Amino acid sequence: MARSALLNVMVQAVFKAGKSLARDFGEVQNLQVSLKGPADYVSQADRKAERIIREELMKARPTYGFLGEEGEEIKGTDGAHRWIVDPLDGTTNFLHGIPHFAISVALERQGEIVGAVVFNPATDELYTAERGGGAFLNDRRLRVGARKALSDAVIGTGTPHLGRGNHGKYLVELRHVMGEVAGIRRMGSASLDLAYVAAGRFDGFWERDLAAWDMAAGLLLIREAGGWSTDAEGGGKPLEAGSIVCGNEHIAKALREVIQRPIPSK
């Protein structure tokens, strides 16, 4: 596959940060037996990865803005472009030695996502997409799953964790979805879960209370793999709403209808 100069910049940045995270992940696995625990070490690894990515991207395109999970937003001087970065999506998995985490980098141009990279350093799976150019896993072209019936579908999701609200609402949605689908998976890394939708591994996905860096790259991967996405309320703007429902068009629309069912009266 041929990549543009901008996509190559993104790929090289995530590869460099990925080498750092892979080394740190090996150390975290060794720290699992420590009573002190690896939490502080993981926080340092997260910040270090973002610093590497920011330096690489800003070196290549110094006029672009930068929005990352770990630091304050940098406003770009060109006013049109912005990098959107999650240096370690799946921190809890990383902390516990579970190899399901990713680096997510998206390029936004005048409000539209035009480039995407999601990379899992533990598996060397690199997901890339450019607007109008398709989505790829390493060098393999991606297509979303073809299943049309929820009863045949495996659906990914994310659960509200400690410190977040909406637990009750989520449990109602989960109960509704459980009654309609073949299976539900909660993997713990939204950007990688969205990449799984693009690859056809998940037939669909939904989650609320997400930040832009959780979704930006995954949204383009899904679109370029022939998928469809909206927010949980059906407004069509996941990044603004902070929620997402996605899959192929049949699955995503059916899934959104299910999660919109009213809360049953007691």
From Swiss-Prot:
Keywords in UniProt for this one? Hydrolase, Magnesium, Metal-binding
Residues noted as binding Mg(2+) 1 in the record, renumbered to the chain: E69, D86, L88
Q: Which reaction does it catalyse?
A: a myo-inositol phosphate + H2O = myo-inositol + phosphate
Top enzyme category: hydrolase
Cofactor requirement: Mg(2+)
Q: What InterPro entries is this protein classified in? A: IMPase, Inositol_monoP_metal-BS, Inositol_monophosphatase-like, Inositol_monophosphatase_CS, Inositol_monophosphatase_SuhB
Q: Where does Mg(2+) 2 bind?
A: D86, D89, D214
Instruction: Keyword check for Transmembrane, yes or no.
Output: no
The EC number(s) given in the record are 3.1.3.25
Asked if the Swiss-Prot or TrEMBL record annotates the protein with the keyword Hydrolase, the reply is yes
Which terms does the UniProt entry file under GO BP?
A: inositol metabolic process; phosphatidylinositol phosphate biosynthetic process; signal transduction
* GO molecular function terms noted in the UniProt entry: inositol monophosphate 1-phosphatase activity; metal ion binding
**Family in the record:** Belongs to the inositol monophosphatase superfamily.
- What protein name is recorded for this chain? Inositol-1-monophosphatase
Species of the source: Rhizobium meliloti (strain 1021) (Ensifer meliloti)
Which gene is the coding source of this polypeptide chain? Answer: suhB
